[in-house]
Amino acid sequence: MTDMRRLGQRAKQASLLIAPLSTQIKNRFLSTLAKVLVDDTQTLLAANQKDLANAKEHGISDIMMDRLRLTSERIKAIAQGVQQVADLADPIGQVIKGYTNLNGLKILQKRVPLGVIAMIFESRPNVSVDAFSLAFKTNNAIILRGGKDALYSNKALVKLIRQSLEESGITPDAVQLVEDPSHAVAEELMQATDYVDVLIPRGGARLIQTVKEKAKVPVIETGVGNVHIYVDAQADLDMATKIVINAKTKRPSVCNAAEGLVIHEAVAARFIPMLEKAINQVQPVEWRADDKALPLFEQAVPAKAEDFETEFLDYIMSVKVVSSLEEAISWINQHTSHHSEAIITRDIKAAETFQDLVDAAAVYVNASTRFTDGFVFGLGAEIGISTQKMHARGPMGLEALTSTKFYINGDGHIRE
């Protein structure tokens, strides 16, 4: 028997053991875990330093190092996310609807756990805790397979969670970490149909594509953020400048950072110089501009076709000038990864049209795309941001990790 099969068997057994846990027990444990995370900050930072040292040795960029880095403040934020999950209403057992049918059968539809969730993710060690807290609150067992660059951090975090579970009298196999970073083991997890009820990949385009091609278990696609901001003809250009600077430069390595800028031709000649001057005072950006935008920049390079399809995760941004709202919507729908999109405008009708017709999980008016986040949306820590339409869409909180079951009670009913 392979190690992966053993992990799968233990996860399946754990899912049965934690299925009956009450809301009170789950919340008490999560509150304890939030405190333990803060108390053990130095242990976690020491493990993270090993990952950072390895990353530096392998020449990983500063921006990607930021995804990997834990700090005392970030650990506090992770703990706050866990506590927020504890404070949220428990969806398990929630009655969605109840009725008596024509035969006199009493029928209830309730929310129930999915069972065993597998998570394959890259770089960001906070995902280990975020994913576990949501899975545990919804009575699911979880198998975590992080990237090799965060192995020490993930091992320390999962060890801490497992110890806390055991001390609370709960099976530690409610969470397990796949420590083997090989692609072969990852593929085995993708195909573990006997044990895994759903697989959630969270990472770059290559990871998502690999999972789509090789997984045999059900998959919820998340993550890739080719995110656009459209500056409309009726935009407040001061507002647009602040929003673009925030969405591009605040944390360029995250999936809700803006990657593409679409500008109406009526304001392009005023807005581009204004934006370029302002952003250079904060953080210079490499502009990859189309033929109409290029001469309006002091410094830019001609965009290639692939630039409009790329999630840069860096201080780089593609720029497209359009002649109408309709062209902007068409362009964005052609290139979007269906994550988050935004329009800056004072035209209410244009805003409504944009929100109705742009095909993305989150569509903003006059706000930065950086808000697409489970914590910000009040969902607690998120397990990912779904870019598909089936089962879940957008930041995935507790309800996204549940299924439904029909409970039918009769009194000797038979069907004639």
Swiss-Prot record:
**EC numbers on record:** 1.2.1.41
Please, which domain of life does this record's source organism belong to?
A: Bacteria
One Pfam family hit:
Aldedh
Instruction: Tell me the Gene3D superfamilies matching this sequence.
Output: Aldehyde Dehydrogenase, Chain A, domain 1, Aldehyde Dehydrogenase, Chain A, domain 2
Please give the pathway this protein is involved in. Answer: Amino-acid biosynthesis; L-proline biosynthesis; L-glutamate 5-semialdehyde from L-glutamate: step 2/2
* Biological process according to GO: L-proline biosynthetic process
Catalytic activity as recorded in UniProt: L-glutamate 5-semialdehyde + phosphate + NADP(+) = L-glutamyl 5-phosphate + NADPH + H(+)
For this protein, the parts annotated as crossing the membrane are none
Going by the UniProt record, its keywords in alphabetical order are: Amino-acid biosynthesis, Cytoplasm, NADP, Oxidoreductase, Proline biosynthesis
Q: Which GO terms describe its molecular function?
A: glutamate-5-semialdehyde dehydrogenase activity; NADP binding
**Entry coiled-coil feature ranges:** none
Main EC class of this protein? oxidoreductase
Query: CDD domains, per this entry?
Result: ALDH_F18-19_ProA-GPR
The places in or outside the cell where this protein is found are: Cytoplasm
Q: Which GO terms describe its cellular component?
A: cytoplasm
Do you know which SUPFAM superfamilies this protein is assigned to?
ALDH-like
> Which family is this protein grouped under?
Belongs to the gamma-glutamyl phosphate reductase family.
Q: Which HAMAP family match?
A: ProA
Q: What does this protein do?
A: Catalyzes the NADPH-dependent reduction of L-glutamate 5-phosphate into L-glutamate 5-semialdehyde and phosphate. The product spontaneously undergoes cyclization to form 1-pyrroline-5-carboxylate.
Q: What is this protein called?
A: Gamma-glutamyl phosphate reductase
Say which species the protein is native to: Streptococcus pyogenes serotype M4 (strain MGAS10750)
Q: What's the encoding gene here?
A: proA
